[in-house]
Amino acid sequence: MLVNNVGMLYDYPEEFLDVAGGYQKIRDLISVNITSMNAMTRLCLPQMVSRGCGAVINIGSLAGVSPAPLVTAYAATKTYVEKFSTTLHQEYARKGITIQCVHPGFVKSNMSQYLIPDELPGFLAPEADKFVRSCMARFGISTVTAGYWAHDLLWVLPPLILPESVRKSQAFDVMSLAREKALNALKQ
């Protein structure tokens, strides 16, 4: 089994033209989030094909399927993860290989420390080990999943009950608060 759990984010949420590190930071983000996933898959897939079985889990993000202002390039790379995973699954499922894309919401980690709103209920941001157990229990059920029940709700319910303009506005507010939180932490 190959798990492509790669992720690089900006130092803090920021408008695209103002990202610290400029275009080089964006290039690095693309290299880590997309190029390394492709390279590892190309490295491991031949052995899976020769054995006639295998599994690849590619970690995307809810940012790749939901409004994600102030992390534009990151969100775009995570959208790529889904397209790569679903089309690769179509190519290799008949050869016994399952390829799945997981789009988690907030999971407690070093990378997400500034992004998780303080008022967010704990069940919406599980510890990494709890998320992994949930994700593995769902492996092979669908090609694309959020991996965790509460993240399923965050993915499915908002488009059903809120207009897109409201979801975009809320996402901007959440990411603006995350930006503020990160900048305040950097000042200390």
Residue positions per predicted region:
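SDR active-site lid
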Residues: 89-170
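A short helix-coil junction within the Rossmann-fold of NAD(P)-dependent oxidoreductases
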Residues: 9-13, 43-52
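Flexible, glycine/small-residue catalytic loop immediately N-terminal to the helix bearing the conserved Tyr-Lys
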Residues: 13, 48, 66-70, 92
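Residue(s) in the substrate-gating loop at a strand-loop-helix junction
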Residues: 61
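Conserved hydrophobic beta-strands of the Rossmann-like cofactor-binding core
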Residues: 2-3
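Conserved mid-core segment of classical short-chain dehydrogenase/reductases
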Residues: 9-27, 70
